[in-house]
């Protein structure tokens, strides 16, 4: 069975997380992703957060599946020649360098277009054009500047960043969609184009409900927020709302049986209006179904602390899974707080390919995420990440068509290997 992106070749100049997330997704869909790495060094994450000495870290392996690796010194004249040939043979160049790095390498957009007019150049930057476009950005910086941190946490506490990598991985996923869109448009125009995704923009896109609420504030308090029921006035900016639901339906994280010793013995519970009467029956408060203080959503808003306190009395008598089973029978929206250990041990996620076990030649077997997007006609097979420069000669011969003599000549030039240390006299 062919893959969705089979025949698409991607020149991958990305590193760390945002760019590799993008190119890995495209590789899972069948694109031939050629990861260009510095000789002797490679992607910096190969050596970051290592759990096993002298072995590629999980940080690297889990972001670079299904790719091929070529080492190339782009400052070397022969290296520049090889890069020029790669540009001719590839459909997309993806990079997440700092601003201006491609230009300083000697390959600005105009030159790339002259070499290959069909080439799509896709870039991730921290900020879009403006006063901050030259600033260095990492995951937590993106969360802070994109509106996530200011709206995450509790009202009386500090802004918080999330555990999910919405700045890095989130922007990488945005860029992947942009690349596929540009590839489709190219089938009509025959031309390549630039595709850009700024991390600030990506985070803001994921925080759109908070931008929604910012505008709603102009017309009155946000009644579904806990502070409304507590009588706390709103300021002029969207507040941090703890674990309140962002969809307009009141929700909270509640304790379950065992919470005293298990830091994840909790469940998220939403008091959705259509199932309110079922909620009343489950928790043993049938009179609330007709009591004017509780029967209607508007009447419940000032009493959310009391209501969730009563629901929590019930959830504390059940494990999070027992509570979920009972609530699901009545179509009451809820979800257990799952630890990473629980997720890693969930066999159902392995059966769907959401979690995959990968065998690596130097670190052995490890667990990774698989493709979160499932295509019925293009199943994603997750293969291991490449060793540094593992496919260098293969790419030179098979992709660029170089002869053995040419490959040897390129090696002799030093374009593919780390600089040789001079022997001490």
Swiss-Prot record:
Pathway: Metabolic intermediate degradation; oxalate degradation; CO(2) and formate from oxalate: step 1/2. Its EC number is 2.8.3.16. The active site is at residue 168. SUPFAM superfamilies: CoA-transferase family III (CaiB/BaiF). GO terms for molecular function: formyl-CoA transferase activity. The keyword Protein biosynthesis does not apply. The keyword Transferase applies. InterPro entries: CoA-transferase_III_domain (IPR050483), CoA-Trfase_fam_III (IPR003673), CoA-Trfase_III_dom3_sf (IPR044855), CoA-Trfase_III_dom_1_sf (IPR023606), Formyl_CoA_transfer (IPR017659). CoA binds at residues 17-18, 38, 72-75, 96-98, 104, 136-139. GO terms for biological process: oxalate catabolic process. Keywords: Transferase. Substrate binds at residues 247-249. Belongs to the CoA-transferase III family. Frc subfamily. HAMAP family: Formyl_CoA_transfer. Homodimer. Involved in the catabolism of oxalate and in the adapatation to low pH via the induction of the oxalate-dependent acid tolerance response (ATR). Catalyzes the transfer of the CoA moiety from formyl-CoA to oxalate. This is Formyl-CoA:oxalate CoA-transferase. It comes from Bradyrhizobium sp. (strain ORS 278).
